[in-house]
């Protein structure tokens, strides 16, 4: 039976989604998502899940609510499919989730709501502002600053008399009205207030002010949505509680383009330093089935050497060997050559040791290693991608080489995502990543800080017309992390 889940993704930091919300992302067949979610969450989807972007920016949207409702209905009517409506914050806190749930109910569609952390609470926390404090505020009240018909019509006299913390969402276009109405209704003009812009994100900004100066603060600092506006004595604790302001990489958003399985060490480093990042897999890697390659695997004893130049090559080579039931004990006489520590460790995960490891992550270094250590005239097995340069194969003219394309790189299945128009730090681990990213996001590359893993990737980037900001001295993941460390030292 089909079902729709309305899931809150939290205020922006991907780590703030609930366990159940993440589980449903991993199960969903259709994901209908908004602008303010963290896009890394979409990397958790099934490989065949279909994405629909229906985001709104301010009060503008290419999707009307009626159209979103109809899309939900269309997906939900697919028998046996799970539809996920992924919304920023909590789906029922000014998120139109209740409207969508009622619409589905009217049309006989089963739905379930998974709460999320609202920016009205989580956003304040990241700004160092508690919603309550027993000495100064025993309650909090959340309001929308904008309705479908314009500025929210509220009982200002009642609001001005309320004890506790007043929190306004979606209010940036009406700050002057809100502050003037509250002051006119008797609220103390010197009451503390604060704005938290893009709460929990790398470019979060916090501005401390007072009720009477809030509009001027908003104008002088060009504060826009998404922002939380808070009024109350709890603001006095902001500097003492703030844990987010001292980030060494604030304002920076790093884009990683490798398969997410290969990014864990890089992600851990960025998370430890409270840096924001996006994982965008613009390239899909799929196996190429070749009868001749299968015959080579079944006759593996015939080879003296095996060349594995990438982590993908390791994965597809050993997966195919396992699928064919090849007994790994038959590899006893084979010497394995690889590039880099990560590729070596992937080989070890299958129970093998790399005999020759090129520490520099370049094919030239690999060629030097092979030609100086391989016995000439012997049989060599060289599985590689369909995009592999021909230089390694060409350098092996003195050997009896069987080279096979065992996997292909393709960006045909990639669905372009909405990315903010800003300066990103983009890390390219291969030429194919650069070529693919340029196909989808050339406007972002024009002003990005571009990092390259090595000289071949740098040449490809420059051939596309872009300048490389930094190239890794060590051509592997650790070398790329070192470039981030340089940025931290520079910022400090």
Model-found features: residue ranges?
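Class I S-adenosyl-L-methionine
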Residues: 1-14, 19-117, 122, 220, ...
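Structural motif
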Residues: 3-6, 29-30, 49-52, 81-85, ...
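Signature of uroporphyrinogen-III synthase
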Residues: 5, 11-12, 49, 58-79, ...
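Class I SAM-dependent methyltransferase SAM-binding "motif I" and its flanking Rossmann-like core
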Residues: 13, 90-162, 207, 356-362
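A glycine-rich beta-strand to alpha-helix segment
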Residues: 69-125, 164-179, 191, 379-401, ...
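A short alpha->loop->secondary-structure connector
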Residues: 105-108, 131-133, 184-190, 324-330, ...
């Amino acid at each position: 039976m089909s079902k729709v889940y309305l899931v809150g993704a939290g205020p922006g930091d991907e780590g703030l989604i609930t366990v159940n919300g993440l589980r449903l992302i991993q199960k969903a067949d259709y994901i209908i998502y908004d602008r303010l979610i963290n896009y890394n969450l979409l990397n958790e989807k099934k490989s065949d899940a279909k994405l629909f972007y229906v985001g709104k920016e301010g009060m503008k949207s290419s999707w009307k609510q009626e159209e979103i409702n109809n899309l939900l209905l269309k997906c939900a009517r697919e028998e046996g499919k799970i539809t996920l409506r992924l919304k920023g914050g909590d789906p029922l806190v000014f998120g139109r989730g209740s409207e969508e749930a009622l619409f589905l109910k009217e049309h006989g569609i089963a739905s379930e709501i998974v709460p999320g952390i609202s920016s009205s609470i989580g956003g304040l926390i990241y700004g160092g502002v508690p919603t309550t404090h027993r000495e100064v505020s025993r309650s909090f009240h959340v309001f929308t600053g904008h309705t479908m018909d314009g500025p929210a019509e509220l009982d200002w006299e009642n609001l001005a008399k309320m004890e506790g913390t007043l929190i306004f969402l979606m209010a940036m276009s009406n700050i002057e009205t809100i502050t003037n109405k509250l002051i006119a209704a008797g609220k103390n003009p010197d009451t503390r207030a604060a704005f938290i812009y893009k709460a929990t994100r790398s470019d979060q900004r916090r501005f401390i002010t007072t009720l009477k100066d809030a509009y001027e603060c908003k104008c002088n600092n060009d504060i826009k949505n998404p922002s939380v506006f808070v009024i109350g004595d709890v603001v006095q604790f902001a500097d003492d509680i703030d844990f987010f302001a001292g980030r060494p990489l604030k304002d920076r958003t790093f884009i990683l383009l490798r398969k997410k399985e290969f990014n864990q060490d890089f992600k851990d480093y960025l998370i430890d330093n409270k840096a924001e990042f996006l994982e965008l897999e613009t390239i899909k890697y799929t196996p190429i089935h070749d009868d001749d390659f299968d015959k080579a695997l079944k006759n593996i004893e015939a080879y003296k050497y095996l060349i594995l130049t990438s982590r993908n090559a390791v994965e597809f080579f050993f997966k195919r060997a396992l699928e064919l039931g090849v007994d790994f004990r038959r590899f006893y006489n084979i010497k394995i050559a690889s590039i880099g520590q990560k590729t070596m460790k992937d080989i070890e995960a299958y129970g093998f040791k790399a005999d020759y490891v090129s520490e520099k992550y370049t094919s030239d270094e690999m060629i030097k290693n092979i030609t100086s250590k391989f016995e000439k005239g012997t049989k060599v097995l060289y599985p590689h991608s369909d995009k592999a340069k021909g230089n390694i194969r060409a350098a092996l003219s003195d050997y009896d080489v069987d080279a096979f394309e065992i996997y292909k790189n393709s960006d045909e299945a990639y669905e372009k995502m909405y990315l903010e128009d800003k300066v990103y730090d983009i890390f390219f681990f291969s030429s194919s990543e650069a070529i693919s990213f340029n196909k989808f996001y050339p406007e972002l590359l024009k002003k990005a800080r571009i990092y390259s893993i090595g000289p071949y990737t740098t040449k490809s980037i420059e051939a596309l017309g872009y300048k490389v900001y930094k190239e890794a001295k060590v051509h592997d993941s650790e070398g790329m992390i070192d470039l981030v460390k340089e940025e931290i030292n520079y910022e400090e």
